[in-house]
């Protein structure tokens, strides 16, 4: 097998992980900003705001783990001889 294919798989896997990490970081930051803004405006609504926040963060992190699975597929399923 051509070594450029293996190198391409590794570079592609790295790009997938980098994009997923950047997206997850931005998503978590936006959700955290909305939570802090909401609690600062209405402190009594803190209990009602935490549930949607944790659901949003969980979905964002789930998308990152899906990226991790695709990275593993690209890197480890590439046949290298």
Swiss-Prot record:
Keyword 4Fe-4S included in the entry's annotation: no
Gene3D superfamilies tied to this protein: F1F0 ATP synthase subunit C
Membrane-related topology note: Multi-pass membrane protein
UniProt keyword list: ATP synthesis, Cell membrane, CF(0), Hydrogen ion transport, Ion transport, Lipid-binding, Membrane, Transmembrane, Transmembrane helix, Transport
Positions bearing the site annotation: Reversibly protonated during proton transport: 61
Pfam families linked to this entry: ATP-synt_C (PF00137)
GO molecular function annotations of the record: lipid binding; proton-transporting ATP synthase activity, rotational mechanism
GO cellular component: plasma membrane; proton-transporting ATP synthase complex; proton-transporting two-sector ATPase complex, proton-transporting domain
Protein's cellular compartments: Cell membrane
Top-level division of the source organism's lineage: Bacteria
TM helices/strands, residue ranges: 5-25, 57-77
Gene Ontology biological process terms, A to Z: proton motive force-driven ATP synthesis; proton transmembrane transport
InterPro entries with a match to the protein in the record: ATP_synth_csu_bac/chlpt, ATP_synth_F0_csu, ATP_synth_F0_csu_DDCD_BS, ATP_synth_F0_csu_sf, ATPase_proteolipid_c-like_dom, F/V-ATP_Csub_sf
Functional description taken from the UniProt entry: F(1)F(0) ATP synthase produces ATP from ADP in the presence of a proton or sodium gradient. F-type ATPases consist of two structural domains, F(1) containing the extramembraneous catalytic core and F(0) containing the membrane proton channel, linked together by a central stalk and a peripheral stalk. During catalysis, ATP synthesis in the catalytic domain of F(1) is coupled via a rotary mechanism of the central stalk subunits to proton translocation. Key component of the F(0) channel; it plays a direct role in translocation across the membrane. A homomeric c-ring of between 10-14 subunits forms the central stalk rotor element with the F(1) delta and epsilon subunits.
HAMAP family the UniProt entry points to: ATP_synth_c_bact (MF_01396)
Family per record: Belongs to the ATPase C chain family.
Assembly: F-type ATPases have 2 components, F(1) - the catalytic core - and F(0) - the membrane proton channel. F(1) has five subunits: alpha(3), beta(3), gamma(1), delta(1), epsilon(1). F(0) has three main subunits: a(1), b(2) and c(10-14). The alpha and beta chains form an alternating ring which encloses part of the gamma chain. F(1) is attached to F(0) by a central stalk formed by the gamma and epsilon chains, while a peripheral stalk is formed by the delta and b chains.
Note: Dicyclohexylcarbodiimide (DCDD) binding to the active glutamate residue inhibits ATPase in vitro.
UniProt-recorded name of the protein: ATP synthase subunit c
Biological source species: Mycobacterium tuberculosis (strain ATCC 25618 / H37Rv)
Lineage of the species this protein comes from: Bacteria, Bacillati, Actinomycetota, Actinomycetes, Mycobacteriales
This protein's encoding gene: atpE
């Amino acid at each position: 097998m051509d070594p450029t294919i293996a190198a391409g798989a590794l570079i592609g896997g790295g790009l997938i992980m980098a994009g997923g990490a950047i997206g997850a970081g931005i998503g978590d930051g936006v959700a955290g900003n909305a939570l802090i803004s909401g609690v600062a405006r209405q402190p009594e609504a803190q209990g009602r705001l935490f549930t949607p926040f944790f659901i949003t963060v969980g979905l964002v992190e789930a998308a990152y783990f899906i990226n991790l699975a695709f990275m593993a597929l690209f890197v480890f399923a590439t046949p290298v001889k």
